Amino acid sequence: LLLKPYYSIKNVTIDGYINALDDFEALIIADPKTPFSEADLFTIDQFVMKGGDLMCFMNTLDIKNDTLYAQGYTHSTRKNLRLEHMLFDYGFKINDNLIMDVNSIPKYDPRFDESRLNWYYQVLSTNTKHPIVKNIEPVGMEYVNQIEFTNDNVKPILTSSTNSNRSGLAPIVELNMSFNFDDKDPKLVSNPNDKKNQLWA
């Protein structure tokens, strides 16, 4: 909605149509839930190859919050969107893990009245000096994957803080996870001030 005064924004369904994106300059894929077909991936790839801009806001893991609240934990499962395979060809590897960051947004704990957890899975981004984000407030990102790049000529826009770490592949997400760390001085890594700990998200 904030972009409407400056851009013409429309929803588009590719549905295997090779020319579905011909009238667009940029494509935003936001929180996809189901796998992309080979035909749709081919159309998107051709759009990018012809100079179209592509923005993907996605997570490769599915986390059921209702199960998390009911049982105190939940298994994360891979969405297998197939889009990540195309992005890998562009030099972006999206790992099937989760970033945990002390710089995070607290989460309401439904098991206790007015109780909030240090919810390290809801990362509060550390903005870089990139012109796109340098004048905006930090962005909250829940259940965010780590991104790796095969190309060194990449400028990160949003990262985690230096006091962050990554989970294993497809982890179990637990509400009690936060109690495993010292609330007064939580450290997810042994050297929480080292910039090498910053993860791209």
List PLM regions with ranges:
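Acidic, S/T/G-rich, low-cysteine, solvent-exposed domains in lumenal/extracellular/periplasmic regions
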Residues: 1-201
